[in-house]
Structures are given as structure tokens and as C-alpha cells.
Design a protein with these regions (language model features):
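N-terminal glycine-rich phosphate-binding loop and ensuing alpha1 helix
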Residues: 3-175, 183, 192-210, 219-220, ...
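Generic recognition of flexible, low-complexity loop/linker segments
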Residues: 6-7, 81-84, 217-221, 247, ...
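Conserved beta-loop-beta/alpha segment of the NTase-like Rossmann-fold superfamily
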Residues: 166, 171-263, 269-270
């Protein structure tokens, strides 16, 4: 694509400020910025922008709660046998989404490097990898881990694993790849500069994971290794139960394309997407898209009608990922208004705004659910599997995450009727290398 064609795209999309900036640059710097614009495929990006403008925020004519398999009503022994067989046959791999930085924690490194275990200060990466290692040893299979990073943390993540990861897993069984970046716009629709010759970019959301798997040939690797099922989780939830044979067995028994764990919401305002049936299809509706009157509505028993929230724990059939990414995966884009640092050509300085000044474009992984032929929603319990690390303080903070880990293991001690001095105030941690399930622990 020539410079003239780039300029035409910018002009057609009212990018007059950027065109003016291009004209004011030296020839060398202008060439660099043009090259960066080419790499970002801005023509496709503007189609994304137009597509989000055309979308209605809530576009369903009929919506009702999804059918959820409740934890207490599932025949675990039946489904466990299916899951254990798949694990022992090496048909399961693990997919960790780890593209985030720890900035909101006051930690300027990949979030997975944050030390979070309450006693030993193990990092998120180590906690997850030790679970995976222990699962492989327990079920007798070679554990494979696929890690999606971002351009902002890829190199540091790979370096961290090269220096530490061989203590947890065989590095030859870890596959790293980056998700795609997209530009952002300000509130007036102008592309945002991060430097004199470069645009601000950000990852395209966890929904970009499926296409990233395909584009980076990860699904081809999975097929060669005989992997049929992918256990998806996000790096910032250290309580996620990896290699869960019951959940996996439910997925296999039901011949599902996608299975998702959900839990009862704390209250109507909790910021999690809800499991629903919209226009006849299972889906997760993002909390910000669910009308308020539906969010607070209760059933005859006094429970929230839309009671079950998604916690980003899924199982995908690899064949399903292949099927929906054969040509191109057209998941909807969602806008997120954020504080975005920007370069000012007028002053020559990088400015950090105090209030949201721009719009990022993101895809959500759960928007692939309506494309599935069969979906399973399975209830898990908050204390068992959800202690996300999002913030330095407040909800989903360092403290609440550490407390959640400690409570999880203290419950093991209680079930085993093991007590010690000052038990209630004690901080407890059990290594996954010792036990990954209570049955092993006791």
C-alpha cells in the first residue's frame, strides 16, 4: 500500500489531525509513521469503528436465564470417568491468557509475575504451572501449556519462563504467542499517537484469543499432538481448578463445543457477564449490556433471575475453534472508554490524562458461545474457584485474593478435621505439588 493510499484512507475517515501531523514531519519520520500505519491495517480498523457505531447496545427480542447444571445436582462419578480418561490419553491442553500488565497493582511487569500466594509468595505463573505439572504427574500425561501474551509483555514473559519455568514444566511443552493489537481513538474519533511516529495500540481483548490461536498455527500443533480439548483460563485467577475431570467430563459427555463455569452472583451489581438464552441461543451477556430492570429482577424464590455470572473458565473443543476460524472470526467489538496516554504534536510531550479520553476496541471470548452447536454452563462455588487479582486495593485486590487462597486451603483442613493453634486467624497455603484435590490432601 502506497503513502497516497494511506492518506486517502485517513482522509475518508476524517483523520485530518493525523494528516496535518504527517505533513509537518521530516521525510524520514513521515516514512516511519506511514510504515507503522501500514502494519496496523488501518482500513480494517476503521471498519471495526464503523461496525461498533452501527451496533445496538441491547439487540435481543427475547431473553431468559440459561439452564445451569448446579454443582450439588451433578453426578460427579459419571462425568469424572469421562474427564479422567481424556486426561490420561493426553487429549487436554491448557490455555492461559496472560497479556496484561500489573499496572493497577502498582507492579510494572507482566501480571503473571506478581507474587500472590499468601505464605510462599509464589507468582501467579508459578501457581498455575505447578497445578498443571501436578495434574500431568497424577493422571500420567505430558502437560502442554499455550500462553497468549501481548506486545507489551511478551518478551519479559518469555524471559521469565526461560529463567524460572524449567522448575515447573518442560519448556519444550510451553507455546507462547501474541494476540493482535488495535489502535484507539479519542472521543472525537481521532487516532491517538503515543509518539511522534507511532500510534497508541492495545490488545484486542480476550475474544481475540481464538483467532490468535489459528493465526499462530497453535491449533495445527494441537492436532499433531492429539489434543482435542483446551482448558481456557485467565492468569489473574489463582484459584482456577485446572484439569478438572468433572467439568471436562461434562463437556465430553454432552458433546459440547464450549463449556463454561459460572457462579452465583454476590448481588445484582457485580460486574460479571450473565448466562442467558437470547433469541433462542445460549450466550453470556456482558453486565454493562444487561438492562437494569433485568439485572435486578428476581424469581419466585427471591433469587436474582439472572443469577449466574461468567468467571472466564471455559473448555473449548479444538475442532470447534478450527471450524469458526476457517475463514475469519467475526465476533462483535465492544468499546471501552479508558484513560489513554497520548503524544501531543503541539507540545512534543506525552500526556497522561486524569479522566477517560479515548476508546479501545475489544472482543469478548464468550461471544463465541452463540456459534456453538452445544454449550454447557456448569456451576462452581466462589470460595472454591474464584479469587481474581484485579486491583491494588478494594474489591478483587491483593488482599482479597490472598485471603481467598488461604480460605480455600483452610477449608481442606476443616473438612479433614485438622486444627491448630489460632486456626481462624492463620494464613494457610498448600503446594499443588503436594495435592491438587482435597481427596489427595486428606
Amino acid at each position: 500500500m502506497s503513502e497516497q493510499e494511506i492518506r486517502k484512507i485517513l482522509e475518508d475517515n476524517n483523520q485530518y489531525l493525523l494528516l496535518k501531523h504527517l505533513d509537518n514531519l521530516s521525510e524520514d519520520k513521515r516514512s516511519i509513521l506511514i510504515a507503522n500505519l501500514k502494519k496496523l491495517d488501518i482500513s480494517s480498523f476503521f471498519n471495526i469503528v464503523k461496525g461498533t457505531k452501527d451496533q445496538k447496545k441491547f439487540q435481543y427480542s427475547e431473553i431468559k436465564p440459561a439452564e445451569v447444571l448446579e454443582n450439588s445436582k451433578v453426578d460427579e462419578s459419571l462425568f469424572r470417568s469421562y474427564g479422567e480418561k481424556a486426561l490420561k490419553n493426553g487429549e487436554v491442553a491448557f490455555f492461559m491468557v496472560a497479556g496484561g500488565q500489573g499496572s493497577r497493582l502498582g507492579f510494572e511487569h507482566p501480571k503473571g509475575m506478581f507474587p500472590i500466594s499468601p505464605v510462599c509468595s509464589k507468582t501467579l505463573f508459578q501457581m498455575h504451572c505447578e497445578k498443571i505439572h501436578a495434574s500431568g504427574k497424577y493422571y500420567g500425561f505430558t502437560p502442554r501449556l499455550f500462553i497468549m501474551t501481548s506486545s507489551s509483555n511478551h518478551d519479559e514473559t518469555v524471559k521469565f519462563f526461560n529463567e524460572n519455568g524449567r522448575d515447573w514444566l518442560n519448556l519444550n511443552d510451553i507455546y507462547f504467542f501474541k494476540q493482535r493489537d488495535l489502535p484507539a481513538i479519542d472521543m472525537n474519533g481521532n487516532l491517538i499517537l503515543i509518539g511522534e511516529t507511532s500510534l497508541f495500540t492495545a490488545p484486542d481483548g480476550h475474544g481475540g484469543a481464538l483467532l490468535a490461536l489459528k493465526e499462530n498455527n497453535m491449533t495445527s500443533i494441537m492436532h499433531k499432538l492429539g489434543i482435542k480439548y483446551l482448558s481456557y483460563f485467565q492468569v489473574d485467577n489463582p484459584l482456577v481448578k485446572l484439569a478438572d475431570p468433572v467439568f471436562l467430563g461434562l463437556h465430553i459427555f454432552n458433546n459440547a463445543d464450549i463449556s463454561s463455569k459460572v457462579l452465583a452472583k454476590r448481588d445484582a451489581s457485580e460486574k460479571v457477564g450473565v448466562a442467558a438464552i437470547a433469541d433462542g441461543k445460549p450466550c453470556i451477556i456482558e453486565y454493562s449490556d444487561l438492562p437494569y430492570e433485568l439485572a435486578i429482577k428476581k424469581d419466585d424464590d427471591g433469587k436474582l433471575l439472572f443469577n449466574y455470572g461468567s468467571i472466564a473458565i471455559h473448555i473449548f473443543s479444538v475442532d470447534f475453534i478450527d471450524r469458526i476460524t476457517t475463514d475469519a472470526l467475526h465476533l462483535p467489538y465492544h468499546i471501552a472508554k479508558k484513560k489513554i496516554p497520548y503524544f501531543s504534536p503541539d507540545t512534543g510531550y506525552l500526556i497522561n490524562p486524569e479522566t477517560p479520553n479515548g476508546i479501545k476496541f475489544e472482543q469478548f471470548i464468550f461471544d463465541s458461545i452463540p456459534l456453538a452447536n452445544k454449550t454447557v454452563f456448569y456451576e462452581t462455588l466462589r470460595d472454591d474457584e474464584f479469587a481474581p487479582l484485579k486491583n491494588k486495593e478494594g474489591d478483587d485486590s491483593i488482599k482479597t485474593c490472598k485471603d481467598g487462597i488461604s480460605l480455600f486451603y483452610k477449608n481442606w483442613f476443616k473438612r479433614a478435621e485438622i486444627k491448630f493453634d489460632d486456626f481462624e486467624r492463620a494464613t494457610v497455603e498448600v503446594s499443588s505439588l503436594f495435592a491438587i484435590e482435597y481427596e489427595q490432601f486428606k
